[in-house]
Design a protein with these regions (language model features):
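Short, Lys/Arg-enriched N-terminal segments with co-localized hydrophobic residues
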Residues: 55-74
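Class II aminoacyl-tRNA synthetase catalytic cores and aaRS-like
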Residues: 71-370
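Intrinsic low-complexity, disordered N-terminal segments enriched in polar/charged/small residues
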Residues: 7-9, 29
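Hydrophobic alpha-helical signal peptides and transmembrane signal-/tail-anchor segments
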Residues: 27-31, 38, 43-46
Length: 370
């Protein structure tokens, strides 16, 4: 658009552009207009008048300004998360759905074909769901279903003591959403993969679908969730600190150094400096974020990159207050894991430590013991 146009011609040009865009799109787009048009008061007021009407609805705006044309559509409004027609595992376990026809989606974890009857095990985010295929009843051909395919299954929920979680779905239909291009390179349906670390990493998107492999991420989630929930309950404020800096927060030479637009920079070892700064603002702060340490090592107890759970608190009487807060976190989180992550604990075969009473020993006493 030529901004040298006089005000009246410019307004006509803008009106024409708005009409064209209203006829083809669901909203108003002024991206193509140069900033120079704001120098013309009439054009600016017209744009302002148009923009002020957008929240009130597309139709009112069109009528007021005489905008019309074929192909116009009413502006659609997004009102939030839609209720899904498909059920999750937690929904299937409810008493009221037993005997009801339901829809579930998921990935085919494995198929056990017994002839006239087959068990199609679906893998969902909450765990495994057993589906029962009956030849001549289920309404589809089992040969069309492949392991690792994603499907939408329809069937009747029934109790079954031998099925995972005590329920199964007696299939009435199945819609294939996607199919694998080739057989899976790893036996992900096995309890343990029993393959090399190299193979697991080479096929990481596949190996992580194994129940034991993915359970570790759920435990990690529980630890971080417990940290956040507990500290929120204790009046802490969550902060987010920079990870690229000019200097380290803790000092030392073990830093990952990088070029930051031709200036030297480092990856932060710790948010300590920022935590101390924000204690003066909120009294109690915490952060869950990655930290980086350029330390060569040959043990499993050292990591160059990990997720650090940091908190800082003011107005304390001594370090014992910090120890008490840490103990409170451990107690809260271990109970959370036992309650909300029991399946993952069982799959991994781990035992949650008891945290009711944690011994507190002085450093000089520890040195004598070792």
């Amino acid at each position: 658009m030529d901004i040298a146009l006089d005000e009246s011609k410019l307004k006509v040009q803008i009106e024409f552009s708005v009409r064209v865009q209203c006829g083809w799109y669901r909203g108003f787009y002024f991206d193509n207009f140069r900033p120079g048009i704001l120098k013309y008061p009439g054009a600016f007021l017209f744009l302002r008048d148009i923009a002020s009407e957008i929240p009130q609805g597309y139709t009112r705006c069109r009528k007021k300004h005489g905008i019309s044309g074929k192909g116009e559509r009413k502006m659609e409004l997004v009102k939030g998360v839609k209720k899904s027609e498909t059920l999750e595992l937690a929904d299937l376990l409810k008493e009221e759905v037993k005997g009801q026809t339901v829809k579930v989606n998921g990935a085919v974890h494995t198929i056990r074909d017994m002839g006239t009857v087959a068990f199609v095990i679906l893998r969902k985010r909450g765990g495994l769901v057993q589906c029962v295929y009956e030849k001549g009843v289920s309404g589809f051909d089992l040969k069309d279903v492949k392991e690792a395919a994603t499907v939408e299954a329809t069937g009747v929920v029934a109790e079954s003591e031998k099925a995972p979680h005590g329920i199964e779905i007696r299939l009435r239909g199945m819609r294939i959403l996607s199919e694998p291009a080739a057989p899976m390179p790893l036996p992900i349906a096995k309890w343990k993969l029993n393959t090399s670390l190299e193979a697991k990493l080479n096929y990481r998107p596949i190996s992580l679908r194994n129940l034991r492999e993915r359970a570790r991420f759920r435990i990690q989630e529980g630890l971080v969730r417990g940290f956040r929930d507990f500290l929120y309950g204790e009046g802490f404020t969550e902060i987010h600190t920079p990870k690229i800096g000019a200097k380290s927060a803790e000092g030392g030479a073990n830093l990952f150094r990088l070029d930051y637009f031709h200036r030297p920079a480092i990856l932060q070892q710790s948010p300590q400096f920022y935590k101390q700064m924000m204690v003066g603002v909120f009294d109690r702060v915490f952060e869950t974020a990655p930290v980086f340490r350029a330390e060569k090592h040959n043990t499993k107890r050292h990591l160059n990159e990990y997720t650090s759970l940091d908190f800082e608190m003011g107005y304390i009487d001594g370090f014992e207050d910090v120890m008490a807060m840490e103990t409170g976190y451990l107690q809260y989180t271990m109970k959370l894991l036992e309650k909300e992550y029991a399946d993952e604990i069982r799959i991994l075969g781990i035992e949650i430590p008891k945290t009711e009473d944690i011994p507190a020993v002085r450093f000089d006493e520890i040195k004598k013991l070792v």
